[in-house]
Amino acid sequence: GALLLKSIPKRMLVIGGGIIGLEMATVYSTLGSRIDIVEMMDGLMAGADRDLEKVWEKFNAHRFTNVMLKTRATNAEAKKDGIHVTFEGEKAPSAPQVYDLVLVAVGRTPNGKKINADKAGVAVDERGFIPVDSQLRTNVPHIFAIGDIVGQPMLAHKAVHEGHVAAEAAAGQKSYFDSKQIPSVAYTDPEVAWAGLTEEQCKTRGIDYEKGVFPWAASGRAIANGRDEGFTKLIFDKQTHRIIGGGIVGTHAGDLIGEVCLAIEMGADSVDIRKTIHPHPTLGESIGMAAEVAHGTCTDLPPMKKK
């Protein structure tokens, strides 16, 4: 695997600027490798709102030699002095670049067509996924499927929850996969985490929303930690004021997002969250303060006129 190498490459190319690619890039940069990243899309960390990703990008500007967006690798040739890679696109170098190691992190392809599921009568779609219902049951009533093979997002915590539902359903219980959100976390430095709907998804779906953003530059704990580059953002339905999404960028963002997940599942509104007493000084209280910002009652920031 990517972490079982016998030596640390001096110069490394990561193909793919998604979560896995950036996590591996962070690891090897920390170990001393000079890293280039190439990504076909116009931004890194697909799925996250740009404002979250931009904080990560600014903090890590010194880590990476070259980040090539709207660019792709077209050819790689192993020679005595390394791997010569040719690029094309908006940020493509004019000449081939030489690397000690190339890591391909462009996603995974489901293998439903390669496991002989058809011999059990289990349907597999054209992409290789196995379709299931809300109880994770396939078209064969006594066969269940969970995890990456049933579709996106390909995340371990989603698979575990699906496993619980499938086991309970198989035992005859009325258990269904009906979660309102599935959190995503990039274990980079800083971490980036989000749950529920993003701002981009709200805009695409025509959802009228409001948000509250609390900058960690105003967090006593973040300042004391020497890591105040992040922020906490909560997204609310503008009509009901119920939370529908949230994102956090900063140290331990993955640990903090759980409260946002629970708030979404419980249908909490901005008042529920802002009136929940959070311990001080902690990073977690930024969630309550973001709700205060959305409600127009935050006393830890200069007065803001509520829109």
Model-derived regions: residue spans:
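Glycine/Thr-rich phosphate-binding loops of Rossmann-like dinucleotide-binding domains
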Residues: 23, 28, 111-114, 153, ...
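Rossmann-like NAD(P)H-binding beta-loop-alpha module
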Residues: 6-48, 155
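A short alpha-helix-loop-beta-strand transition element characteristic
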Residues: 66, 123-126, 173-183, 207-212
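A Rossmann-like FAD-binding core segment of flavoenzymes
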Residues: 31-134, 197, 204, 217
